[in-house]
Every structure is written in C-alpha cells, then in structure tokens.
C-alpha cells in the first residue's frame, strides 16, 4: 500500500515539474508593457523579466535628463509589476491544489 502511494506521489511530482516547465516557457513568451509620463515612455518585457523594448517619445529627448531617467525607471517598474501580476495569475491555476500558506510567492 505504501509503495503504491509513494509511486503515485512521485508520478504527481514529475507531472507538476513538467507543467511548471511548460508554464515557464509560456511566461517567457508573454509580453507586458509598462508606461509612464502618459505613455511617453514605454517598456516592454516578458513575464520572465526580459526587457524587449524601450520606447521614448522624441519630444522627451530635448527635455531634462533627470526627468527622462525618472520616467524610464517608472515605466520599467510598471512593467515589472504587470509581469508579476500576469505570472501570478497564470500560475494560480497550477498551484490552486497545493497547500500553500496565504500570500506565499513561488520563485517564478
């Protein structure tokens, strides 16, 4: 009896590992866009936090360098928040059956 339960748990763990691998591959393909300055600065990144594009409206290039740097940082942070939210949403279906404490964040 114990052997059968252990084998079932091992099979379940392997299936979960495979599902995680597939989900991580999918997250690497999903892009989110963070913005600041009413869309004048945009950062596009994957849900694996790989920046794909940074777009800066030409009207900002002649302006204050410090302001532009702040807008780029704000757009990047906005993109990171969106990537995290999207990742959590996608992964919640996979982890819904796990006995995890409330607010527990998995490292992906």
From Swiss-Prot:
Its main location: cytoplasm. Pfam families: YbaB_DNA_bd. The keyword rRNA-binding does not apply. Residues 99-108 have a biased composition (Pro residues). One of its GO terms (cellular component) is bacterial nucleoid. Residues 85-95 have a biased composition (Polar residues). The keyword DNA-binding applies. Disulfide bonds: none annotated. It is found in: Cytoplasm, Nucleoid. Residues 84-108 are annotated as: Disordered. PANTHER family: NUCLEOID-ASSOCIATED PROTEIN YBAB. Belongs to the YbaB/EbfC family. Homodimer. HAMAP family: DNA_YbaB_EbfC. This is Nucleoid-associated protein Bmul_1447/BMULJ_01796.
């Amino acid at each position: 009896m114990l052997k059968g339960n252990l084998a079932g748990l091992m099979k379940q763990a392997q299936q979960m590992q495979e599902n995680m691998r597939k989900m991580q591959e999918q997250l690497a393909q999903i892009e989110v866009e963070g913005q600041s300055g009413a869309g004048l600065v945009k950062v596009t990144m994957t849900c694996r936090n790989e920046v794909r594009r940074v777009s800066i409206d030409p009207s900002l290039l002649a302006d204050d360098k410090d302001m532009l740097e702040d807008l780029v940082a704000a757009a990047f942070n906005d993109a990171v928040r969106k990537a995290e939210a999207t990742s959590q949403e996608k992964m919640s279906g996979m982890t819904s059956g796990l006995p995890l404490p409330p607010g527990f964040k998995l490292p992906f």
